[in-house]
């Protein structure tokens, strides 16, 4: 019974948010989702952002904004004290959403998905903040960017690629790689690679070294929000880490690429740039 009541509260919260978005665009937005924060600024709604999450650092305009926690530790009291008329939250933050519903604060429900999910989020976000045309224009621009990348790599051999987005420095422990779902997987496919874990219906996979040997990637593409630690020697040091799996084709041919930058791992307005960088690593000749 309690679970049913909680579900009804959440539904009411989301319906209230939808109704609010249709009648009056939000003027004071609190965003707990860095990807959506980027979208807000990209469609010209930056001045309407009243606070952001603890992890927001782009665009630079967010530097002076109040911080209200993040996915696991949202500060409800501080959020309410800011008197927002829209809060961007993750779909999994059901407790927060229920509390906001009780305070009659509209919620924009964000759910992590693939590239199409980015377009869907923008399509819903634009009207909610009075920026419908700007959001649709950004969607069009992003689709055009991705289309240009597809054109560049069309007809190229598609290497079997291991896309790594998490690993302990100097080690092959704590390995996280792209599975067959999610925006990273979608970007890799557009960039002209074949995800070696495309058959795994998850966004991330934690493979053993034995599994990596069996999958035999032809290219290893590592993406990190921050650069490699260790200065100019870092790439060589990290290549030596991968050399432990010397029988993997990517290691044999030294087709190991390290890309760094937060834009590479955020499902937001910079995915076109990130996808092009993937393609440049996989098919450098297509950009000469």
Residue positions per predicted region:
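Short secondary-structure boundary segments
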Residues: 33, 91-92, 165-167, 200, ...
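Bacterial N-terminal signal peptides
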Residues: 9-19
């Amino acid at each position: 019974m309690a679970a049913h009541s909680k579900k009804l509260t959440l539904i009411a919260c989301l319906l209230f948010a939808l109704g609010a978005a249709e009648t009056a665009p939000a003027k004071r937005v609190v965003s707990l989702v860095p990807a959506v924060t980027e979208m807000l600024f990209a469609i010209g709604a930056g001045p309407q952002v009243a606070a952001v999450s603890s992890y927001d650092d782009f665009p630079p305009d967010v530097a002076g904004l109040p911080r209200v926690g993040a996915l696991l530790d949202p500060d409800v009291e501080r959020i309410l004290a800011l008197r927002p008329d829209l809060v961007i939250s993750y779909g999994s933050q059901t407790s927060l959403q229920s509390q906001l519903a009780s305070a009659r604060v509209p919620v924009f429900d964000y759910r992590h998905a693939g590239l199409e999910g980015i377009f869907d989020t923008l399509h819903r976000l634009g009207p909610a903040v009075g920026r419908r045309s700007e959001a649709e224009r950004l969607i069009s621009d992003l689709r055009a960017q991705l289309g240009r990348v597809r054109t560049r790599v069309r007809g190229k051999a598609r290497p079997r690629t291991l896309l790594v987005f998490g690993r302990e420095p100097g080690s092959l422990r704590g390995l996280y790689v792209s599975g067959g779902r999610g925006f990273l997987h979608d970007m890799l496919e557009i960039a002209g690679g074949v995800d070696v874990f495309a058959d795994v219906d998850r966004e991330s996979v934690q493979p053993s070294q034995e599994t990596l040997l069996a999958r035999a990637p032809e290219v290893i593409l590592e993406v990190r929000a921050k650069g490699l630690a260790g200065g100019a020697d870092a790439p060589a040091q990290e290549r030596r880490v991968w050399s432990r799996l010397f029988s993997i084709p990517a290691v044999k041919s030294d087709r190991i690429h390290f890309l760094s930058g937060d834009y590479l791992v955020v499902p937001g307005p910079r995915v076109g740039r990130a996808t092009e960088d993937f393609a440049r690593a996989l098919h450098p000749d297509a950009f000469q």
